[in-house]
Amino acid sequence: MTRWAMVADLERCVGCQTCTAACRHSNATSPAVQWRKVLDIEVGSYPNVSRVFVPVGCQHCADPPCMHVCPTTATRQRADGIVTIDYDICIGCAYCEVACPYQARFLVEKPHFAYGPAMQNEVERADTARVGVAQKCTFCSDRIDFGIENGLTPGLDPRSTPACVNSCIADALHFGDADDPNSNVSRLLREQKSFRMHAELGTDPGFHYIYGKPNDTEEASAAVPSIASVAGEMRTRGVEPALQEHWNWKAASNFICGGVGTGLFVFTAFVGLHYPQVLSLGFVALAIVALGLSILLLKIGRPLRFIYVLRQPQRSWMTREAWIALFYFPLATLALWTGQPVLLIGAALLAIGFLFSQGMILHAAKGIPAWRSAWVVPLIVTTGFAEGGGLFLPAIAPFPALAPLANAVAMIVAVLALLRALSWRVYLTALASEGVPTRTLMVLRPYRSWFLAGGLALPLALIAIGSVVMSTAAPLFAIAGLCIAVAGAVVKFILVTRAAFNQGFALVHTPVRGSGQAGHAVKPGWSKS
């Protein structure tokens, strides 16, 4: 077997960015896109301050999270370990971007050129197939394939070696077959101390960092400690976690509408078994879910390829959500039209499956620590049920004949609001204990009191008063339901668009140049407290 890997010598890298320029020239990327870039990290505190230069890019993981979430199979892995993107079937959903913990993927929504209008050389080399889709480092796979076809050795022969490695003036970048014990990279990894970035996430990256000679006194390598640090410092910009940008309000709308719509349908279906007059609300629920999906369609880079989202149900939760929707809408429509109990229950189960899929979509995004927590799934599910039940209350408020039903539904919604608040509390506690970017907690924590007051305490008080003073029940239940629904929508909006800071970059060890010893670990912008 062959597994191509790259090794960066942190003692040799001088931060000249020649590899970045070579990559840009070789691959004709847009000015703001750097498949290979070099981080400039300050280590220590005055007066003992040093700088470490760290080349980063796609790690070509053995277990790539980007490939697992891709709904279209555009992201694939070759037998030699190189992770590729098929630009012709990528829809530009950016799911792979939020799943990558190395910030190695880019999505260019429209062509950009260095000086505004395109120059002739830019026109000639521009690759329009990359516009609106994901792109990243390819390890210069075309050069590797050329070399193998012509009997050359990638990593040793320049014509079959990645451009960044060829251009490195300090001989800090190396490329070769990590599965070959006699290769150049295998020898380096045996003779030098090394680590891999974010290895604790289980991605098995193919990019190694060496930082000195082995010795008997050094402690064994361990996972990077979550070192508390002040977020937003100038010296850690570009290194600490940054807010993801591609999943914006349009993506948040899908989670909001999906939760409200499926939750409302579940209430409508089960209540409709005994009160058929409420079944018309089910069509409103379907319209809300459809609205969220329609807004999402406007977000993707290549919307005309949306049908490709159905290609990978075996791995991608986004594909599973789409397949569930494909069966959910016709079955739910038929169930509401006929009122058949079996169809109503079946459609309600599909609605629950759709809601669960939305939670799993976030959980599978390994690149966003606030999403990959297992507790995000119960938070999304309970929030969806509470939102749907909350909207159900004002919907039935104008009908006096449904007053006894409203009282029972209000009690159920109150319980769901309590469960949602419990899920929220457990979720925040889990984030603090597991470790997340400092700014994620800075965003989420201020909303705790607001969420509990407006999304739990006030609605429960209104429901309690309405249950005692029956003459005020309908308006109070309606207001309580709206409070619960709005609180859930706000939580999802914040979670998707405001608290979604990426993994950032981290070094298990930093080199002490010339000593062969390891320095301190670096993980700026993170905290466990």
Question: What are the roles of these predicted feature ranges?
Answer:
Residues 1-247, 256, 272, 287, ...:
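Non-ligating segments of multi-cofactor redox enzymes
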Residues 199-203, 382-387, 446-453, 511-529:
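Cytosolic juxtamembrane regulatory segments of multi-pass membrane proteins
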Residues 248-252, 293-296, 300-301, 498:
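Alpha-helical multi-pass membrane segments and their bilayer interfacial helix-loop junctions
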Residues 264-324, 331:
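Membrane helical hairpin/interfacial module
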Residues 219-223, 433-436, 499-509:
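Short, Lys/Arg-enriched, Gly/Pro-containing loop segments at transmembrane-helix junctions
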Residues 300-303, 426, 493-506:
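Juxtamembrane/interface segments at transmembrane-helix termini
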Residues 245-249, 253-260, 271-280, 315-316, ...:
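Long, contiguous internal "core" modules enriched in hydrophobic/ aromatic residues
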Residues 217-235, 240, 302-307, 355-366, ...:
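Juxtamembrane interface elements at the cytosolic ends of transmembrane helices
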